[in-house]
């Protein structure tokens, strides 16, 4: 029995419509902080911006799309967001 041909999903750069989801503590200015950090590293499409709070209000999720240029850029974005101390997860 042969194994199915499974291709890994690689991102082709540049990717003009790369979705980013940032989850963090609900604090005043969280959305603006996310936009500021992302804008330092990539072109941000603010038309795709969505913000949502968790049921209990403890966490906030900010979603938007960026122009992703490279794996290094995505790594730098992740590092910069995590360095804020209020970001819990970047997807």
UniProtKB/Swiss-Prot annotation:
SUPFAM superfamilies reported for this sequence: YbeD/HP0495-like
InterPro entries from the UniProt entry: UPF0250_YbeD-like, YbeD-like_sf
Gene3D superfamilies: 3.30.70.260
A single Gene Ontology CC term: cytosol
Family assignment from sequence similarity: Belongs to the UPF0250 family.
Record's protein name: UPF0250 protein PputW619_0619
Natural source organism: Pseudomonas putida (strain W619)
